[in-house]
């Protein structure tokens, strides 16, 4: 029986990995092991070597306090791979962790077939990483159509498979969703996403909550706030910040429903912005990192925007409030402006949809099936 070792370090990778594992096991008996979240564990019928929350860290300086623990986890993962002797190693995103594991494994198992899913953003910064990946991996799966040339020119086999959000089922009946959640027709619904990392949540709550309060002051009882959560532990982190708020709020564990039912979203930068746009909901994006991390990012990065829709469109389709502009007054003013300006909202939705179509939204591109086909035909012979 063939054995595949998967590694995913965050929720989006777990989602993509779960889909691929299900497809692979549909017509072939395989043993799946590795590191993943609930989706991958259920699809592969395995127990993760350790919880993915252990490696779900972001930012240069945010990682420093955990660096020795992360090194131990890297070494633990490498030894587990060596002990299990898989036929294929498949890593998904989380480059800070997965690349280091793959590099160490390559030294000890030079013949092992290795695939990485989610190309590192070399078009944004550190283009030299492409050559480093070419030395380690046999194949790279890219989510964006313009990425393969960056890697093929340095000798790495890179295939465009499309973005995983393209195969999700999005909700379109806002009226039915409002009835399901018992939300009045004239109540404005604001969706607030805080991220999947504890550090992100703690960093953004002190900014987002005052911004929401200012919006509430204009709408009073006609405002409902939804916090979509991926992890029940996050509810425990958030609740202390909400003890004295004046606005009504609910927690939801169905993020796509949360996006679709909302009139507007205040979103942290990330994959969630594509899902919100695909749900037909306008948004603003706000994000803040450690100041030292920000300085390093600004020195390295060569793109103007952080939101993928803006990056591809090369203009600010979705308003961004990043770092020093991630400030409650600025955020609340823009939220109120969008709530009162349907023309601006319609323009954002229309332009976002055009960008999503460029990415294959509502097309016949099914990333997990394309990935499965390549793995099955070329690596599981």
From Swiss-Prot:
> Which is an annotated Pfam family here?
LpxB
Q: Which InterPro entries match?
A: Glyco_trans_19
What top-level branch of life does the organism fall under? Bacteria
Known pathway: Bacterial outer membrane biogenesis; LPS lipid A biosynthesis
Q: Does the keyword Lipid biosynthesis apply?
A: yes
Coiled-coil residue spans: none
In its UniProt record, a GO molecular function of this protein is: lipid-A-disaccharide synthase activity
Question: What keywords tag this UniProt record?
Answer: Glycosyltransferase, Lipid A biosynthesis, Lipid biosynthesis, Lipid metabolism, Transferase
Any one Gene Ontology cellular component term annotated for this protein: membrane
Gene Ontology BP terms: lipid A biosynthetic process
Which SUPFAM superfamilies does the entry link to?
UDP-Glycosyltransferase/glycogen phosphorylase (SSF53756)
The reply to whether Transferase figures as a keyword in the UniProt entry is yes
Q: Name the chemical reaction catalysed here.
A: a lipid X + a UDP-2-N,3-O-bis[(3R)-3-hydroxyacyl]-alpha-D-glucosamine = a lipid A disaccharide + UDP + H(+)
EC identifiers of the protein? 2.4.1.182
Stated family: Belongs to the LpxB family.
* Annotated function: Condensation of UDP-2,3-diacylglucosamine and 2,3-diacylglucosamine-1-phosphate to form lipid A disaccharide, a precursor of lipid A, a phosphorylated glycolipid that anchors the lipopolysaccharide to the outer membrane of the cell.
Q: What is this protein called?
A: Lipid-A-disaccharide synthase
The major lineage groups are: Bacteria, Pseudomonadati, Pseudomonadota, Alphaproteobacteria, Rickettsiales
The gene coding this protein: lpxB
């Amino acid at each position: 029986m063939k054995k595949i070792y998967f590694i995913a370090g965050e929720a989006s990778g777990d989602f993509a990995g779960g889909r691929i594992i299900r497809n692979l096991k549909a017509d072939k008996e395989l043993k799946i092991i590795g590191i993943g979240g609930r989706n991958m564990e259920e699809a592969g019928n395995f127990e993760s070597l350790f919880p993915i929350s252990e490696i779900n860290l972001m930012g240069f300086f945010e990682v420093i306090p955990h660096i020795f623990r992360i090194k131990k986890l890297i070494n633990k993962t490498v030894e587990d791979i060596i002990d299990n002797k898989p036929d294929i190693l498949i890593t998904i995103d989380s480059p800070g962790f997965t690349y280091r594991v793959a590099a160490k494994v390559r030294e000890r198992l030079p013949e092992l077939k290795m695939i990485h899913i989610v190309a590192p953003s070399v078009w944004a910064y550190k283009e030299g990483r492409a050559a480093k990946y070419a030395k380690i991996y046999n194949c790279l799966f890219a989510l964006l159509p313009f990425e393969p040339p960056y890697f093929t020119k340095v000798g790495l086999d890179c295939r465009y498979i499309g973005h995983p959000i393209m195969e999700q089922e999005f909700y379109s009946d806002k009226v039915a969703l409002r009835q399901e959640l018992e939300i009045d027709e004239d109540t404005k619904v604001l969706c607030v996403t805080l991220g999947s990392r504890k550090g992100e949540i703690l960093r953004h709550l002190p900014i987002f909550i005052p911004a929401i309060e200012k919006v509430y002051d204009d709408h009073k009882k006609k405002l409902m706030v939804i916090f979509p959560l991926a992890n029940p532990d996050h509810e425990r982190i958030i609740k202390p910040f909400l003890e004295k708020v004046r606005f009504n709020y609910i927690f939801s564990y169905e993020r796509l429903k949360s996006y679709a039912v909302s009139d507007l979203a205040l979103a942290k930068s990330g994959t969630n912005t594509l899902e919100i746009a695909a749900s037909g909901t306008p948004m603003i994006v706000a994000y803040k990192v450690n100041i030292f991390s920000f300085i390093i990012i600004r020195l390295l990065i060569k793109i103007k925007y952080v939101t993928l829709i803006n990056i591809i469109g090369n203009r600010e389709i979705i308003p961004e409030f990043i770092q020093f502009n991630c400030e409650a007054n600025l955020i609340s003013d823009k939220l109120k402006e969008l709530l009162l300006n349907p023309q601006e909202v319609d323009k954002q939705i229309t332009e976002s949809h055009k960008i999503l179509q460029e990415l294959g939204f509502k097309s016949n591109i099914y990333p997990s099936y394309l990935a499965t086909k390549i793995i099955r035909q070329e690596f599981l012979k």
